């Protein structure tokens, strides 16, 4: 609720009054006081107010901004919704179930038969020799520059 006072010079002074009970738990006030934390550390040598779990850290630099992520999710949902009803039912109408299915290599043949994947033939490559092949050239005559070895 706002309380408005009119000052003698004609300007208004607006106070915001919160009549709701406070949402903070005052019983933790002492534990949050830096002076109390330091005194307790000096006395016991322990810092007990820290989290008891190890933090989780990761490289998040490749994650797009929130809007881009939401657009990606929306496009994925729309693509899933365009599948035939019997196929959506096969995955319990859940894009997550479909993703789990497609990520499992054991399901590759079924995914191809359902038309969710295409069979891609990998070209056969000639076996490469693992031995080092070096070419030897006769030593240069005196006064000639030494050639750079070729790999």
UniProtKB/Swiss-Prot annotation:
Compositionally biased tracts (Polar residues): 122-137
Keyword Zinc attributed: no
Keywords: Host cytoplasm, Viral capsid assembly, Viral release from host cell
Highest taxon listed in the record's lineage: Viruses
Residue ranges of the region described as Disordered: 120-151
Keyword GTP-binding on entry: no
InterPro entries noted in UniProt: Chlamydia_phage_Vp3
Subcellular location field: Host cytoplasm
GO cellular component terms attached to this protein's record: host cell cytoplasm
Transmembrane segments: none
Coiled-coil zones: none
Primary role: Participates in the assembly of the viral procapsid in the cytoplasm. Internal scaffolding protein VP3 is released from the procapsid upon genome packaging, possibly through affinity displacement by the protein VP8, or by proteolysis.
Similarity comment text for this entry: Belongs to the microvidae B protein family.
Protein's name in the database: Internal scaffolding protein VP3
């Amino acid at each position: 609720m706002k309380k408005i006072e009119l000052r003698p010079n004609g300007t208004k002074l607006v106070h915001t009054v919160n009549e709701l009970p406070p949402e903070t738990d005052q019983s933790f006030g002492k534990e949050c006081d830096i002076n109390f934390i330091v005194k307790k550390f000096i006395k016991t040598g322990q810092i007990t107010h820290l989290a008891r779990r190890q933090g989780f850290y990761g490289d998040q630099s490749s994650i797009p901004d929130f809007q881009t992520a939401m657009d990606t999710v929306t496009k994925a949902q729309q693509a899933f919704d365009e599948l035939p009803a019997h196929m959506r039912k096969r995955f319990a109408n859940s894009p997550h179930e479909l993703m789990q299915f497609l990520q499992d290599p054991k399901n590759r043949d079924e995914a191809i038969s359902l038309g969710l994947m295409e069979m891609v033939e990998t070209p056969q490559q000639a076996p490469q020799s693992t031995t080092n092949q070096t070419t030897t050239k006769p030593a240069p005559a005196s006064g000639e520059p030494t050639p750079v070895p070729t790999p």
